[in-house]
C-alpha cells in the first residue's frame, strides 16, 4: 500500500508540473485565457525580433497586461454618467455687500471657480499647458452637464413661484445692508418668478428662469437639447441593429427586461449610440495587435480539445502488430505542455486568418524527428490555407511543408511504385504511381490559386449578405462549409469532402499508402466538424468592431508575399512539427459562449466614443498650438498626444497600449490619426464638442493674453463726506475696461528682451518707459488669472508683481540671464471701508503706493450694481422635470440578449 501511495504522489507531482503528460486528458480554453496566451506569445516574438536586430529598437520589456481587467474597466465606464441630476442649478453669481446701502458687488462665481483650476503656465512645458486646458475643459463640462428634476417651489397667491435657492443668485448675505425699499423691490421680483407648465414632446415639465453663466448655460443647453430630441430615431436604429447582430450571432432575445418607453412619466436618455463606427477603432495608431487581442478576449467562446474515436487508429494505421509506417509510429505520442501551447497557436491562426500566421520553429540542434516532419507535411496540406485570399502560414512554412510531403512520398521507396522526376528538381516535381500516375506538382504551394492547400478549388471568402458591421462583410468558409449548417457530431461530415482532400486521397493511393489513405478517409468527418466549428466561431462569435476590416484583410497575403509593409501586418507565431499532428487529432469544441458577448456592442461603443473624444482633443490642441505659439514655444505634435493620453481614462489608455505600441507611435501616426474624420457620436462627444467651442474664447477658461505693466498710484481718496463715500461704494481693481491705445504700448518679445538684457540695459529701458507713463506688454502668451478680494491694502507681492521673471547669475565668470513670461496674473479688487471716526486724510499716505500690473478682459467678472438689480441676471430659460417623473438611462439596456419594447413611431 505504501508503494502504491508513493507512486500516486509521484504521479500527482508530475501532473502539477506537466499537465499535458497525463494520457488523453486535455485542457479547456476560453477567450480570456487565449487572449493572455496570444499576447504573451506576440510580445515574446517582438522582443526576440528586437534582440536579433542590428539597429536599436525601443525597449518593450514590461509586465503583460491583464486583458480582462482592462475590458472590465471599460465595462465599468458604462456605469459612469456624463451628467448629473440635481434639484437646483448651481449658483452662478454671489453678492458681496459694501458699506453702501445702494450698491453691491456681484461676482460671477463660475469664472471665480475656473480661476482656481490649474497652476501657473510654463512656456517650456507644453504638456503641462495642454493638461491645464484639458483640466479646465473637464471642469466646464462637469459644471454644465446637469439635469434639473424636482426643483423647490412655493405657492404665492395661487401661483407656483421659484424658491430663491434655485434662481442661481446668492444675495441673502447682502440683504441686511440694504434699505427696506430695496429689499421690498427684490421680494416683489422674486414673487413674480412664476413656474410655468411646459411640454417636452408629450412630457410635462416645469419652465422657469434663473441666473447662469454663459459657458455653463451653453453646456446645459446642449445636454437639454440632446434629451429633448427624444431620440426615437436613435433608439429604433440601435434596437434594429441589435436584432440584426443577434440574428447573425444566433443570440436569442430574452424578455426579462421590458421597458415601456411610451409611458408619459418616463424620460429616457441614450448616452451611447449603435451601431459602432468601427473605423474609429481601427484608425488608432499601431492598433492591430491590441484589437486582435481584444477580439480574442471579448468574443472567443470557451471550448475544449476533443480527440477522435480511438478505433479509427486501430482499424487503419495500427491494425498490424509491427508498426512501420510513420502514422502508426507517432499515433501513441502524448503532447507536452510546450506542444499543446503550439496547438493553441495553430487554432488561433485558424480562427484569425491573415492576422495570425504560422511558421516552423527552427531547431538549432538539428534534432527534428524525420517521422514527425513527414507526417506534418501530409497533414499540413489539409489543415492550412495558403491563398488565394487568406493564409494561415508563411511562404517559408509552405515551402517546408512541401518538402516534408515530398520526402514522405519518397519515404520507404518501393520499386513497385514507379516515380518519374520532373526537370526542375523542386519539391513535389515528380509523378508517382504504377498504372495511373499522379502528378504531385498539384500539391506544390501557389498563393495565387491556393494550390496544394485547403483554399484550392473552393471559395473560402464570400460576401453573401450584409453584415451588422459595415467594415466586415466577409464570410469565411473553410473547406467550403456553410457556417449556418446544423452540426450534429454523430452524423456531420459523413459523405462530405472538398477538392484538396480528394486529391490527397488520390495521391496517397497512387503512392501505395493505402493505410494512410484509409486513416484520412475515416478522419474526414472529424476533420469537417473541426472546420465547421471554426467557421461558426469566426463568422458569429468573433464578428465585432475589433475584427480586421475587409480592405485590410484582402491585401494581407499579397503584401506579405511581395514584401510590402501595411498597416495591419500579420503576427507570425512559431510552432513545431509535432504540434501539427497533435492539432490534427484534436478539434476545438465550443462548450459555452463568452460572458461578455452580450455586452460587447456597448463596450465597443464606449471605447469608440472615448477615442473620438480623444481625437477631438488632439485636433483642438494642435490648433491651439498654432494660435498661441508664444505659450508653447518648444511644443511638438507628439506632446498633444501625450497630454491627451495622460488625461484619458485608465482602461482606455491601457487597451490602446495593450501591446506596448506607444513606444513605436511617431509624429506621422499622430498627425494622420488626428486628421481622420470618422467619429462615434455619443453624449460625451457632443458635450466635448461644445466645450471646445466655448474654449475658443480663452477668457472663458480664465486665460488672458492682455496683461500689461503700467505704474499707477493706488487711489487714496480724501474723506470729506463719509456718508457720500459710503453711498458710492468706492472700490478699485487692476482690471481695465478697454485695452490701451496701440501707440502707447511697447511690446516686448523674447528677442527684444534678450537683446536688451545682453546689453545690460533691460531694467533701464523698462524704467524709462514707466516714467513716461507708458504701457508694456510682455509677449502674447496666455496667463492664468487668479481673482482675489481685499478690504485693506493688498500685500506688496501682489501690487508690485510683474508679468515676467528675470533671473541673472554668473556661471564660470560669464553673466547669464534668463526670461520667463509664463506667470500667474492676479486680478484683485480692493473694497474701501471707512468709519465715522476717520479723518479726511485717513486713507492718505505720505509715500504713495504703486500698482504695476493691469489686466484687460472683455468678460465682466465683477460688477457694481444697484441694490434692486441683484436679481437682474435671472434671464436664462431652464427646464426642470417634475419630481415624480422617471429619468432612465437606457444605455445599459442596449445589449444583445435583451429585448426592448420598441417604440411605435
UniProtKB/Swiss-Prot annotation:
Listed GO MF terms: structural molecule activity
UniProt keyword list: Virion
This protein's record includes keyword NAD: no
One Gene Ontology cellular component annotation held by this UniProt entry: virion component
Subcellular location: Virion
Domain of life of the native organism: Viruses
Family indicated by similarity: Belongs to the orbivirus VP3 family.
Function: The VP3 protein is one of the five proteins (with VP1, VP4, VP6 and VP7) which form the inner capsid of the virus.
Name used for this protein in its record: Core protein VP3
Amino acid at each position: 500500500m505504501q508503494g502504491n501511495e508513493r507512486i500516486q504522489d509521484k504521479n500527482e507531482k508530475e501532473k502539477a508540473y506537466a499537465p499535458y503528460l497525463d494520457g488523453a486528458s486535455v485542457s479547456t480554453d476560453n477567450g480570456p485565457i487565449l487572449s493572455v496566451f496570444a499576447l504573451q506569445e506576440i510580445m515574446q516574438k517582438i522582443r526576440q525580433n528586437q534582440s536579433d536586430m542590428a539597429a536599436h529598437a525601443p525597449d518593450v520589456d514590461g509586465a503583460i497586461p491583464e486583458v480582462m481587467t482592462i475590458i472590465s474597466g471599460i465595462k465599468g465606464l458604462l456605469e459612469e454618467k456624463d451628467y448629473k441630476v440635481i434639484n437646483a442649478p448651481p449658483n452662478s453669481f454671489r453678492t458681496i455687500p459694501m458699506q453702501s446701502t445702494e450698491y453691491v458687488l456681484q461676482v460671477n462665481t463660475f469664472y471665480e471657480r475656473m480661476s482656481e483650476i490649474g497652476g501657473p503656465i510654463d512656456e517650456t512645458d507644453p504638456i503641462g499647458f495642454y493638461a491645464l486646458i484639458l483640466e479646465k475643459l473637464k471642469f466646464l463640462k462637469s459644471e454644465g452637464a446637469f439635469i434639473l428634476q424636482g426643483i423647490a417651489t412655493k405657492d404665492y397667491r395661487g401661483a407656483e413661484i421659484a424658491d430663491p435657492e434655485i434662481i442661481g443668485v446668492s444675495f441673502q448675505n447682502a440683504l441686511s445692508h440694504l434699505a427696506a425699499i430695496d429689499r421690498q423691490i427684490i421680494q416683489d421680483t422674486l414673487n413674480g418668478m412664476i413656474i410655468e407648465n411646459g411640454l417636452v414632446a408629450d412630457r410635462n415639465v416645469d419652465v422657469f428662469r434663473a441666473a447662469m453663466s454663459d459657458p455653463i448655460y451653453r453646456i446645459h443647453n446642449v445636454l437639454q437639447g440632446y434629451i429633448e430630441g427624444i431620440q426615437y430615431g436613435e433608439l429604433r436604429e440601435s434596437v434594429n441593429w441589435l436584432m440584426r447582430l443577434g440574428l447573425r450571432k444566433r443570440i436569442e432575445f430574452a424578455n426579462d427586461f421590458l421597458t415601456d418607453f411610451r409611458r408619459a412619466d418616463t424620460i429616457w436618455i441614450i448616452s451611447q449610440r449603435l451601431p459602432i463606427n468601427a473605423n474609429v477603432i481601427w484608425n488608432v495608431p499601431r492598433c492591430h495587435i491590441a484589437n486582435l487581442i481584444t477580439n480574442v478576449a471579448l468574443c472567443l467562446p470557451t471550448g475544449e480539445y476533443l480527440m477522435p474515436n480511438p478505433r479509427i487508429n486501430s482499424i487503419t494505421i495500427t491494425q498490424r502488430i509491427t508498426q512501420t509506417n510513420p502514422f502508426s509510429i507517432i499515433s501513441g505520442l502524448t503532447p507536452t505542455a510546450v506542444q499543446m501551447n503550439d496547438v493553441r497557436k495553430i487554432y488561433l491562426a485558424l480562427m484569425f486568418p491573415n492576422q495570425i500566421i504560422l511558421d516552423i520553429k527552427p531547431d538549432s540542434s538539428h534534432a527534428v524527428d524525420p517521422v514527425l516532419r513527414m507526417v506534418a507535411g501530409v497533414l499540413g496540406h489539409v489543415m492550412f490555407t495558403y491563398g488565394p485570399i487568406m493564409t494561415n502560414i508563411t511562404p517559408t512554412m509552405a515551402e517546408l511543408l512541401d518538402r516534408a510531403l515530398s520526402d514522405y512520398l519518397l519515404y520507404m521507396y518501393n520499386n513497385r511504385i514507379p516515380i518519374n522526376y520532373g526537370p526542375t528538381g523542386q519539391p513535389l516535381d515528380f509523378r508517382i504511381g504504377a498504372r495511373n500516375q499522379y502528378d504531385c506538382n498539384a500539391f506544390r504551394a501557389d498563393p495565387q490559386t491556393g494550390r496544394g492547400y485547403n483554399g484550392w478549388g473552393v471559395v473560402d471568402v464570400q460576401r453573401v449578405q450584409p453584415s451588422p458591421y459595415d467594415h466586415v462583410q466577409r464570410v469565411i468558409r473553410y473547406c467550403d462549409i456553410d457556417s449556418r449548417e446544423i452540426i450534429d457530431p454523430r452524423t456531420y461530415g459523413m459523405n462530405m469532402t472538398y477538392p484538396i482532400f480528394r486529391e490527397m486521397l488520390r495521391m496517397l493511393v497512387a503512392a501505395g499508402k493505402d493505410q494512410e489513405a484509409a486513416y484520412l478517409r475515416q478522419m474526414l468527418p472529424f476533420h469537417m466538424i473541426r472546420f465547421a466549428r471554426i467557421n461558426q466561431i469566426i463568422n458569429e462569435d468573433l464578428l465585432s468592431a475589433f475584427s480586421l476590416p475587409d480592405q485590410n484583410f484582402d491585401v494581407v497575403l499579397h503584401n506579405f508575399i511581395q514584401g510590402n509593409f501595411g498597416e495591419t501586418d500579420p503576427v507570425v507565431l512559431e510552432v513545431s512539427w509535432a504540434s501539427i499532428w497533435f492539432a490534427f487529432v484534436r478539434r476545438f469544441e465550443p462548450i459555452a459562449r463568452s460572458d461578455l458577448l452580450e455586452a460587447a456592442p456597448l463596450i465597443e461603443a464606449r471605447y469608440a466614443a472615448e477615442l473620438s473624444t480623444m481625437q477631438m482633443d488632439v485636433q483642438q490642441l494642435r490648433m491651439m498650438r498654432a494660435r498661441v505659439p508664444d505659450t508653447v514655444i518648444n511644443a511638438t505634435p507628439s506632446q498633444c498626444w501625450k497630454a491627451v493620453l495622460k488625461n484619458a481614462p485608465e482602461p482606455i489608455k491601457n487597451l490602446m497600449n495593450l501591446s506596448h505600441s506607444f513606444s513605436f507611435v511617431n509624429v506621422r501616426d499622430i498627425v494622420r490619426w488626428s486628421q481622420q474624420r470618422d467619429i462615434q457620436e455619443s453624449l460625451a462627444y457632443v458635450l466635448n464638442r461644445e466645450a471646445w467651442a466655448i474654449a475658443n474664447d480663452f477668457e472663458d477658461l480664465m486665460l488672458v493674453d492682455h496683461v500689461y505693466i503700467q505704474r499707477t498710484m493706488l487711489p487714496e481718496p480724501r474723506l470729506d463726506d463719509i456718508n457720500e463715500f459710503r453711498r458710492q461704494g468706492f472700490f478699485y481693481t487692476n482690471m481695465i475696461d478697454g485695452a490701451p491705445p496701440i501707440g502707447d504700448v511697447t511690446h516686448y518679445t523674447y528677442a527684444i528682451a534678450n537683446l536688451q538684457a545682453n546689453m545690460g540695459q533691460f531694467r533701464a529701458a523698462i524704467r524709462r518707459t514707466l516714467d513716461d507713463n507708458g504701457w508694456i506688454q510682455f509677449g502674447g502668451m496666455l496667463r492664468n488669472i487668479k481673482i482675489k478680494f481685499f478690504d485693506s491694502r493688498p500685500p506688496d507681492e501682489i501690487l508690485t508683481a510683474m508679468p515676467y521673471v528675470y533671473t541673472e547669475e554668473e556661471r564660470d565668470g560669464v553673466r547669464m540671464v534668463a526670461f520667463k513670461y509664463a506667470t500667474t496674473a492676479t486680478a484683485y479688487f480692493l473694497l474701501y471701508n471707512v468709519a465715522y471716526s476717520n479723518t479726511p486724510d485717513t486713507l492718505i499716505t505720505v509715500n504713495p503706493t504703486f500698482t504695476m500690473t493691469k489686466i484687460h478682459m472683455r468678460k465682466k467678472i465683477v460688477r457694481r450694481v444697484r441694490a434692486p438689480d441683484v436679481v437682474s441676471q435671472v434671464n436664462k430659460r431652464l427646464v426642470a422635470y417634475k419630481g415624480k417623473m422617471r429619468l432612465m438611462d437606457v444605455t445599459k439596456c442596449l445589449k444583445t440578449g435583451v429585448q426592448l419594447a420598441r417604440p411605435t413611431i
